[in-house]
UniProtKB/Swiss-Prot annotation:
Protein name: S-adenosylmethionine:tRNA ribosyltransferase-isomerase
Main location: cytoplasm
Role of this protein: Transfers and isomerizes the ribose moiety from AdoMet to the 7-aminomethyl group of 7-deazaguanine (preQ1-tRNA) to give epoxyqueuosine (oQ-tRNA).
Keyword entries, A-Z: Cytoplasm, Queuosine biosynthesis, S-adenosyl-L-methionine, Transferase
Catalytic activity: 7-aminomethyl-7-carbaguanosine(34) in tRNA + S-adenosyl-L-methionine = epoxyqueuosine(34) in tRNA + adenine + L-methionine + 2 H(+)
Keyword presence, NADP: no
Name of the gene: queA
A Pfam family the protein falls into: Queuosine_synth
Domain of life assignment: Bacteria
Organism: Pseudomonas aeruginosa (strain ATCC 15692 / DSM 22644 / CIP 104116 / JCM 14847 / LMG 12228 / 1C / PRS 101 / PAO1)
Gene Ontology molecular function: any one: S-adenosylmethionine:tRNA ribosyltransferase-isomerase activity
Length: 347
């Protein structure tokens, strides 16, 4: 299967670089997987697509202000993007500098604070901060906006590049489908008789890495930490017993649930995942999906194509471009029901 099959032309003007004034003000493109039918709606209309007895599964990861600016003690400027917090003081991070720091190099953080580079792990650097790292990041860190939002972060991003239900700090990118939900909408969802459950997947910077191979099967997926608790397993079981649907909010929730059900049965799981879902891969848990519009040739577009069918997905994206939908993290959303017989690009 070719990566190029997942290319589409996207005008620069359709890349959302700022959030809308209200979270639920986004548009919603509904795709019925079994028929391929499209409906152009507003995100607040999501309620019309939910049924009493459904279960919505959210990712409650919290984005940390993971980008730091500073310099080596010798004077060279650098930029640090924390990828994973290892403990109270140590992190794995990407470092952008004219010359990579060597073990023992002391880094002075802009705004106050310091770290020592301990060792290198392939593309990542292990750093030890002199003070607890999470409070330091909250104090002087910058929100790690994606590369396609080509502007400096501002105060509004601290609130808007974060879901209202974020709890567990550790992500360096937002689970963006969740950005559309405000407290009033969550209350309305529960009032309709829809249950909610929460998984955690700490989204890594690898989510923005381009696929650099020609054949999808040759791609090596990045690893991310996730946790699916017994409470989620029980909630899915109750939902199934009453005939409800499991509605995943975001591809990270999909990857969490399907990682915990790789053998076909959903079980509690805590650890790293490198699950890569593309056309031809089965879904064991998820029946419907809320998701944003993804980058051309990205692994997330491949996941959506596996869920809805390749022809249906690419047709929906073409319609979204033609109708001027806003794309990517701060953009509009889709509601998709699973295609029971999805076709790939080669079918």
């Amino acid at each position: 299967m070719r990566v190029a099959d997942f290319h589409f032309d996207l005008p620069e003007a359709l890349i959302a670089r700022h959030p809308l004034p209200e979270r639920r003000a986004s548009r919603l493109l509904a795709l019925d997987g079994p028929t391929g039918t499209l409906a152009h709606r507003q995100f607040a209309d999501l309620l019309d697509y939910l049924r009493p007895g459904d279960l919505m599964v959210f990712n409650n990861t919290r984005v940390i202000p993971a980008r730091l600016f500073g310099q080596k003690e010798s004077g060279g400027k650098l930029e640090v993007l924390v990828e994973r917090v290892l403990d109270q003081h140590r992190v794995l991070a990407h470092i952008r500098a004219s010359k990579a720091p060597k073990p023992g190099t002391r880094i002075l953080v802009e705004g106050g604070g310091s770290a020592e580079m301990l060792q290198r792990h392939d593309a990542l650097f292990e750093l030890a901060f002199a003070e607890p790292v999470l409070p330091l990041l909250e104090r002087v860190g910058h929100m790690p906006l994606p590369p396609y939002i080509d502007r400096p972060d501002d105060a509004a991003d601290r609130e808007r590049y974060q879901t209202v239900y974020a709890q567990r700090a550790g992500a360096v990118a937002a689970p963006t489908a969740g950005l559309h939900f405000d407290e009033a909408l969550l209350e309305a969802i529960r009032a309709k008789g829809v249950d909610t459950a929460f998984v955690t997947l700490h989204v890594g910077a690898g989510t923005f890495q381009p696929v650099r191979v020609e054949r999808i099967e040759d791609h090596v997926m990045h690893r991310e930490w996730l946790e699916v608790g017994q409470d989620v397993v029980d909630a899915v079981s109750v939902c199934r017993a009453r005939g409800g649907r499991v509605v995943a909010v975001g591809t990270t929730s999909v990857r969490s649930l399907e990682s915990a059900a790789r053998d076909g049965e959903l079980k509690p799981f805590s650890g790293d995942t490198d699950i890569f879902i593309y056309p031809g891969r089965p879904f064991h848990v998820v029946d419907a999906l809320v998701t944003n519009f993804h980058l051309p040739e990205s692994t997330l577009l491949m996941l959506v194509s596996a869920f809805a069918g390749y022809p249906e997905t690419m047709a929906a994206y073409a319609a979204a471009v033609a109708q001027g939908y806003r794309f990517f993290s701060y953009g509009d959303a889709m509601f998709i029901t699973r295609n029971p017989a999805p076709r790939g690009p080669e079918d």
